[in-house]
Curated annotation (Swiss-Prot):
This is Nuclear intron maturase 2, mitochondrial. Nuclear-encoded maturase required for splicing of group-II introns in mitochondria. Involved in the splicing of mitochondrial COX2, NAD1 and NAD7 transcripts. Necessary for mitochondrial biogenesis during early developmental stages. Residues 485-653 are annotated as: Intron maturase type-2. Its main location: mitochondrion. Belongs to the plant nuclear intron maturase (nMat) family. CDD domains: RT_G2_intron. It comes from the Eukaryota. Residues 1-12 form a transit peptide.
Length: 735
């Protein structure tokens, strides 16, 4: 009995165009199968067609699989964006949608938002696959223009902390969610982070060096150091308040400011929709306010399981000391963390206009020994400390400088008041024309340096000093004379400090501030309370780091805090007065107040057994314990550390730098650091003077005089041999 064998497989036919075409056919070859000697032919036949069938059946990679989209690390991708923008800062950004498609940026944004939400870093390997799929759906909705800002019920991805089942909510709860103020949705914060990662490198490479707020690496301390260095010698100051810009601007102006540097439709439309979409807010009416029952003692509050932990008391107290210039943060629509960046984008045109005015206004005097170069920078270093600000020459030096911190500006003018008034008039016209803001002379007051200018809770004033000048006159006579000089003083405002303490209910009274007990720490132990206040005092000392009266202001803060805690302990432990608290707990409140003789074991024994908590005394109880003011020099071309690193990396990456290094090595030779150090040590030990002094003595032999070290009356032959060895070492060391 015969059996037939059929195979369904592809044949490749050769067409006249020399291209292969797959054709499926039904093959029947009974004699081939029936012949037992044709087994090798059947094997060759099947081995030829089976791999082709498997290759065709194999599917392409799934584009919706998150694992296939994570090809690169998100941090390295961000670093690449920063390098590209700092390499070509003037290039218009056109293709930002390609970065918006990169799933690595979305995962990095998810990690950052989760860190802010949960208080702990979430590694990429710990992210669940369901979260990655939801994150991919969010990315696709943004790319397909299906994403809506401020959604309250329809989410592509939810916070890991959010366990609410929105499908089973009642109508009353749904109405409350839709009509009352709610925190920013988790998915909105992720989209904001992605946009910030894309836009921040573009604008940070273009922003002016005169703006300092809402930018990485530029803090209020940076502004104070810039003022101390660059504003010395200015007589008139124009202080402006443009904080109205932080409340919001017209959408058309914001979009036009963005499109000066960014020409990507997808990104622009996404930001425009965030600005246009209304934010749902609710105001509690007077009749709906709940009546608060006053308690004699504060009730201890227990946090819910899913409730985020609030800021510690010391940090909340320090935030109450925020100056007026830094106490306001912009919130534009649904932009969230993008709002500060958009504020700087809009105000960057003001910075550029002021830079042009500063450059055109500068006219140095021929007799001016500080500002005598074309750019206006002082070659002698810091002009306010320790050098003295010089008086101008007969033709009077004209100079101006400008800084901006958020919506507040400060302009220093060296010249007549008429120049400052002219500048103020031009500034009012520019702001009215560009930003549609009506400013008057009250918003831009002109003040003299002798009255003191308040900026960032520090007072800028001029201090007269009488130094002793010593110089050598003709004939070698040393003359000492008393001179007169002026210094720019940056002093912390004690009046503003008292105002902040009064606002936080730490003191009462105007002329003689009286500390009040801080009952917020009533339920805390003495050790915990002292620890909290020590952190606050340490942070305050760091905030006033560059103030000339740092010791005085920090010691005053320590006095207020110490008196407040003493009154708290007197009420808590029923000691009636602060004097008894200081008697039992010492001046710095370091001794435990619960310890009483004859009623409990000694405190040291409890501490040794680990049954008691050590009590740290308050810091800065004496003025001598407060750190000194930081007068470290500030460079004129200062940049943040990350910008210096980027610029240095780009410089080293250029082929021109490598060619210069090769040429230098060919001309000068190569000396290892070990050889150079050993040569320095050898010459120092042999000659008992450093290498740089040896070079000076070699170049200028008349400075040797009658020194016994180089006495020419010594053995000439021995000195000749030593000089030959020393010259060889000097040649290598200089190379």
């Amino acid at each position: 009995m015969r059996r037939s064998f059929s195979v369904l497989g592809p044949y490749k036919w050769l067409k006249p165009s020399s291209t292969y075409t797959n054709v499926y056919c039904f093959v029947t070859n009974p004699p081939l199968i029936s012949n037992p000697n044709n087994g090798s032919a059947i094997f060759r036949y099947l081995s030829y067609f089976a791999p082709q069938q498997r290759r065709q059946q194999q599917q392409a990679p799934d584009p919706d699989d998150p694992a296939n989209l994570l090809k690169e690390d998100g941090v390295s991708l961000c670093s690449q964006m920063w390098l590209e923008n700092f390499k070509e800062p003037d290039k218009t950004a056109t293709n930002l949608t390609s970065y918006l498609r990169r799933f690595e940026l979305w995962v990095l944004a998810y990690q950052k938002v989760c860190c802010d939400e949960l208080g702990a870093y979430v590694p990429r390997s710990s992210i669940q696959r369901s979260a990655l799929e939801n994150l991919l759906a969010l990315r696709n909705s943004v790319l397909d223009d299906r994403f809506k800002w401020g959604s309250r019920l329809d989410f592509y991805i939810k916070s890991p902390r959010d366990k609410t089942d929105y499908e089973s909510l009642s109508k009353r709860k749904i109405k409350a969610i839709l009509t009352t103020t709610q925190p920013t949705p988790f998915q909105d914060r992720i989209v904001q982070e992605v946009l910030l990662m894309i836009l921040e490198p573009i604008y940070e490479s273009r922003f002016s060096q005169k703006s300092f707020a809402f930018r990485p690496g530029r803090t209020a301390h940076t502004v104070l150091r810039v003022i101390r260095r660059n504003f010395a010698g200015y007589l008139w100051y124009v202080k402006g308040d443009l904080s109205v810009v932080l409340d919001g601007m017209k959408v058309g102006f914001v979009i036009s400011s963005l499109m000066r540097d960014v020409r990507d439709k997808k990104v622009i439309d996404l930001i425009k929709s965030a600005l246009v979409t209304p934010v749902v807010t609710s105001k509690v009416e007077d009749g709906e306010k709940k009546k608060t029952k006053k308690r004699k003692y504060q009730k201890k509050r227990v946090l819910a399981e899913d409730e985020p932990k609030p800021d510690p008391y010391w940090l909340e107290t320090f935030f109450g000391f925020a100056p007026e210039e830094a106490g306001k943060s912009p919130q534009w629509g649904h932009c969230g963390i993008l709002s500060p960046l958009l504020v700087n984008v809009c105000l960057d045109e003001l910075d550029r206009w002021m830079e042009t005015k500063v450059k055109d206004f500068y006219r140095p005097s021929k007799s001016d020994v500080i500002w005598n170069n074309p750019e206006g920078e002082a070659d002698q270093g810091n002009t306010s400390w320790p050098e003295f600000v010089p008086t101008s020459g007969p033709d009077k030096t004209r100079k101006m400088d400008y800084v901006r911190y958020g919506g507040h500006i400060l302009i220093g003018v060296r010249g007549p008041r008429a120049d400052a008034a002219t500048l103020r008039k031009e500034l009012i016209e520019f702001v009215d024309q560009k930003y549609m803001l009506r400013l008057d002379n009250e918003n831009l007051p002109i003040e003299h340096i002798t009255k003191g200018i308040m900026f960032l809770d520090h007072v800028l004033c001029r201090r007269v000093v009488y130094p002793t000048l010593r110089y050598t006159a003709t004939g070698g006579k040393i003359i000492s004379e008393k001179g007169v000089g002026t210094l720019l003083s940056v002093t912390a405002s004690l009046k503003q400090c008292i105002k902040q303490f009064r606002k936080l209910l730490f003191i009462k009274g105007d002329r003689d501030p009286d500390p009040q007990p801080c009952f917020r720490m009533f339920h805390a132990t003495q050790a915990h309370t002292n620890n909290q206040m020590n952190k606050f005092l340490t942070t305050i000392a760091e905030w006033y780091r560059f103030a000339d009266n740092r010791k005085k202001i920090v010691n005053f803060c320590s006095y207020i805090i110490r008196g407040s805690l003493a009154k708290l302990y007197a009420a808590k432990y029923k000691l009636r007065s602060r004097a008894k608290v200081y008697k039992f707990a010492n001046r710095n409140l370091s001794l435990p107040l619960l310890q009483k003789k004859g009623q409990s074991p000694e405190y040291q024994n409890l501490l040794r057994m680990g049954l008691a908590e050590s009590v740290d005394g308050l810091v800065y109880t004496r003025m001598s314990l407060v750190p000194e003011t930081d007068y470290s020099p500030f460079p004129g071309n200062w940049r943040p550390e990350h910008e210096k690193f980027l610029i240095e990396y780009l410089t080293l990456d250029e082929p021109k730098t490598l060619e210069e290094q090769k040429r230098f090595i060919r001309e000068k030779g190569l000396v290892s650091p070990q050889d150079y150090t050993s040569m320095l040590v050898w010459n120092y030990k042999r000659n008992a003077i450093p290498m740089d002094q040896v070079s000076i003595l070699k170049d200028q032999p008349f400075l040797l005089g009658s020194s016994s070290t180089y006495n020419r009356d010594n053995d000439d032959q021995k000195n000749k041999e030593e000089d030959e060895d020393s010259e060889d070492g000097l040649r290598i060391a200089r190379m």
